[in-house]
Swiss-Prot record:
This is PTS system cellobiose-specific EIIA component. The modification Phosphohistidine is found at H85. Its cofactor is Mg(2+). The gene is ptcA. Induction: Induced by growth on cellobiose. Negativelly controlled by the CcpA regulator. Also induced in response to galactose. It comes from Lactococcus lactis subsp. lactis (strain IL1403) (Streptococcus lactis).
Amino acid sequence: MTDKYENPTSDDYMGVVMGIIMSGGNAKGLAFQAIQQAKAGEFAEAESSLNEASEQLREAHDVQTDLLTRLAQGEKIGWNLYMVHAQDHLMNAITFKDLAVEVVGQEQRLQALENK
């Protein structure tokens, strides 16, 4: 059992929380950037931004999965409002990225129709 997950006030635990928040924020920013790029007709760049967003989300999701696995195995995992906030950031970023994929696709379709 590791202390970094048991004590929700430890620096290690808060580092994990901040990592999830930062990855979620980065992913959401990249997804928004992808939408802006698509609106400008920069579809390769938009795809690249979406791929980077996916990587940020994967990193945060890996930490989340590790925490859930440890909890399922009976380890004591401390929780506080910061962790709840981190999970909220992550889920919002995942949803925003999923919607950004749809918006980029619609923008491609719209621009293709306009260019006919």
